């Protein structure tokens, strides 16, 4: 048993609201500002900035997926600490909230203009839009069939031609 545990890394995912996940895992894949990054037990020390996206946890042949928002990850041998603003399992994501957040971000971007009438991109508005878009992509990839169908329905009813407008 001890030898088996040696090949696992202790993963902690912490948000301001809860200790989202704690457990021994075989491997983890996270969304970083430099792209997707994977690690296992014994990885050299590492710190990375997180981007909104999917976190993939693998242990004992089972794979779990969760959605992470902005934050950071620190790896130190047998411990990986992820601190982020929010973390959600697919079944906990509210689809209507995602669509509304994306629409609000687009509206904020459209209404903020410089003196020449050109859009001024507020970092907060762009970040809000990116989080919503990352959640939509997460559901399209890892959500249940019902969630994917509902998301497609929301996109059709809320966006022309069912296409999501670009942020910028």
Please report, for each region that a protein language model flagged, where it lies by residue:
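Short alpha-helix boundary/capping segments
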Residues: 42, 60-63, 86-97
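A short local loop/turn or secondary-structure capping micro-motif enriched for an aromatic residue
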Residues: 30, 47, 74-75, 90-92
């Amino acid at each position: 048993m001890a030898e088996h545990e040696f090949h696992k890394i202790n993963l902690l995912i912490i948000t301001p609201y809860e200790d989202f996940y704690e457990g021994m895992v075989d491997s983890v894949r996270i969304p970083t500002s430099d792209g997707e990054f994977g690690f296992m037990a014994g990885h050299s020390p590492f710190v990375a900035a997180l981007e909104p996206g999917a976190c993939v946890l693998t242990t004992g042949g089972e794979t779990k997926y969760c959605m992470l928002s902005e934050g950071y990850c620190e790896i130190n041998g047998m411990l990986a600490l992820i601190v982020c603003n929010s973390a959600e399992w697919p079944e906990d994501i509210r689809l209507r909230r995602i669509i509304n957040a994306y629409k609000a971000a687009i509206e904020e971007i459209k209404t903020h203009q410089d003196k020449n009438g050109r859009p001024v991109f507020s970092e907060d508005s762009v970040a809000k839009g990116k989080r919503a878009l990352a959640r939509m992509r997460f559901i399209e990839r890892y959500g249940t069939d019902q969630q994917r169908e509902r998301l497609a329905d929301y996109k059709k009813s809320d966006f022309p031609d069912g296409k999501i407008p670009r942020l910028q």
